[in-house]
Amino acid sequence: MTDLTSLTLAEARDGLAKKSFTALQLTDAHLAAIEAARVLNAYVLETPEQARAMAKAADERIARGAAGPLEGLPLGIKDLFATQGVRTTACSKILGEFSPPYESTVSAQLWRDGAVLLGKLNNDEFAMGSSNETSCFGPVVNPWRREGSDAKLVPGGSSGGSASAVAAGLCLGATATDTGGSIRQPAAFTGTVGIKPTYGRCSRWGIVAFASSLDQAGPIARTVRDAAILLRSMAGHDPKDTTSVDRAVPDYEAAIGRSVKGMKIGIPKEYRIDGMPAEIEALWKQGADWLKAAGAELVEVSLPHTKYALPAYYIVAPAEASSNLARYDGVRYGARVNGRNIVEMYENTRAAGFGAEVKRRIMIGTYVLSAGYYDAYYLRAQKVRTLIKRDFEECFAKGVSAILTPATPSAAFGIGEKGGADPVEMYLNDIFTVTVNMAGLPGIAVPAGKDAQGLPLGLQLIGRPFDEDTLFSLGEVIEQAAGRFTPTKWWA
């Protein structure tokens, strides 16, 4: 039998429908792969008993012809999504052994459609990071290595566990979240596909909040088709989330293979940053050539406020985080460190519970929201955000269907290599991705090539609001031209 963990999600779905194997066999193969790959530290909690029970129930539904769209397909869930009765910590000490009494809307919809829970995936603490090194469970290791080197590389962040697990064959797909690039950057670093949908497309209910006006859930998968299949189940209106948009969810898979002839693709001149590596520039041109060969028209566009996006993002996001994280005080749930009085208990709990990067962002956020600096920083950043959104609106109003950019300024870097002395060095990883969150737009990262050391590189496509279909059609053109990217297994 084929190695079941090497199948795409679509292939596994079709194999189950043909009864080539059972959901239990598929799940057991993934559980064995997870056990053999613990060195990657992708999972922070494995749920084998629950997975097998869900797989058996899926096999019964398949047998009686009542299969859902994801019936029997084993997935990993980022540890930011509440899973009822299954420990959810946001990879922070402050949540301790917290076991949610409810299920996040996104994961509930996956289970409704028949998916199987393999376990909870590692992420940067409270999703704050670009390398998955801030998790209280330790860093995630990228399954990719530089040619001729055994140095451990980061998988990107904050959804590093999701990206690493998908790339290494430890699940058929995974949930992830994206606040400033946390789906697209890890996807680019691991040779996987990641889509951040339009803000409001997927419910945020039951997802641990980082920055509420920027956070959005989405899938990481091995192929564009797989991402389309997963997003259809994850998306949809939810009355429990006031920012959820009540729009019908299209059949995203139907966009795969659709012609892109005549589409206008914007190439933004502002994304040609100083010091951009030649191989990223060459990859960008290659991607544009592939889309042109498929019948798309390339046009240069201007997004003049791009240069202000990163500083504005690192004001807005920490400001919202400082407010959201005020709820973690040790009183009603999570870890508690006692003190002589309640104020001391708050202080002790937060001092011991939060990691260094989370504390840094809470401090930045509290500072920019303080009376003396609110107008100078926070208010100004929100005005910049409006201008960034307007840049995109003007671009799309000229008939541009999507915008093509690099996904990251480099390939994956080594664990411990960046951001030690200067956090800004790490923040610069988000330079191509934050504009999408600031404007609330959909963006997809698709693997498009390798660097000189054999590491995957990704391209990003940015779409009009709620036009994820077009991103899937264009993304598949790049995927077909570039081919699939699979790391050489060194860990088992």
Swiss-Prot record:
Keyword 4Fe-4S part of the UniProt annotation: no
Keywords: ATP-binding, Ligase, Nucleotide-binding, Protein biosynthesis
Gene Ontology molecular functions: ATP binding; glutaminyl-tRNA synthase (glutamine-hydrolyzing) activity
Any one GO CC term of the record: glutamyl-tRNA(Gln) amidotransferase complex
Classification via Pfam families: Amidase
Gene3D superfamilies assigned: Amidase signature (AS) domain
Reactions the enzyme catalyzes: L-glutamyl-tRNA(Gln) + L-glutamine + ATP + H2O = L-glutaminyl-tRNA(Gln) + L-glutamate + ADP + phosphate + H(+)
Catalytic-site annotation from UniProt: 78 (charge relay system), 158 (charge relay system), 182 (acyl-ester intermediate)
Swiss-Prot/TrEMBL GO biological process terms: translation
Enzyme Commission number: 6.3.5.7
Functional description taken from the UniProt entry: Allows the formation of correctly charged Gln-tRNA(Gln) through the transamidation of misacylated Glu-tRNA(Gln) in organisms which lack glutaminyl-tRNA synthetase. The reaction takes place in the presence of glutamine and ATP through an activated gamma-phospho-Glu-tRNA(Gln).
Similarity annotation: Belongs to the amidase family. GatA subfamily.
Cross-referenced HAMAP family: GatA (MF_00120)
Quaternary data: Heterotrimer of A, B and C subunits.
Protein's name in the database: Glutamyl-tRNA(Gln) amidotransferase subunit A
Gene source species: Rhodopseudomonas palustris (strain BisA53)
Lineage, broadest ranks: Bacteria, Pseudomonadati, Pseudomonadota, Alphaproteobacteria, Hyphomicrobiales
